[in-house]
Amino acid sequence: MNNLETVLITISLLTGGTETVNFDVPIHEAVSSSDVQVEYEIAESDINYLAKTLYGEARGIESKMEKAAVCWCILNRVDSDEYDFRNMKTIKDVVTAPNQFMGYDKDNPLVDELVDIAEDVLIRWHMEKDGVVEVGRVLPTEYTYFYGDGERNWFRTDWRSKEFWDWSWDNPYEENLNG
């Protein structure tokens, strides 16, 4: 239950449910990630699913940003209301679904660098869900498809699309993808 629901229920109980209350103040304001110091408990299984998927899908990619984008693509599917992803509500659902992330294998090793990237992205995702803006997301929410060739990854909004993400957002990992 959020704060607004708690306030409304309390007022309703105090007034016998007969009063209407209007709030002109924002209940939840967006804040920048630089203003927030929060620790998140991230499920180890979620980190492992992402890291093992990264091993299969992006281990040959040099760019941390492109590796992180694979994680964001997976999380975009978890959050998506698209028909294609209607039965994918967890990271496990997405990476183990038939014909989706072919690089996931339960026997893939957990490589420290990939575990660190997976955990970093999950922390940023949870911050975003808590209303923090500018968390260092590297892929817009509508990008739910990707393919890679072992050297680069390309992300798109539809599997048939010829238009790909242009890497125009700031890179929290500080490498230059455009030369």
Predicted regions and their residues:
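N-terminal export signals and maturation junctions of secreted/periplasmic proteins
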Residues: 1-47
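Bacterial extracytoplasmic/cell-wall-associated proteins, especially those involved in peptidoglycan
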Residues: 30-31, 35-179
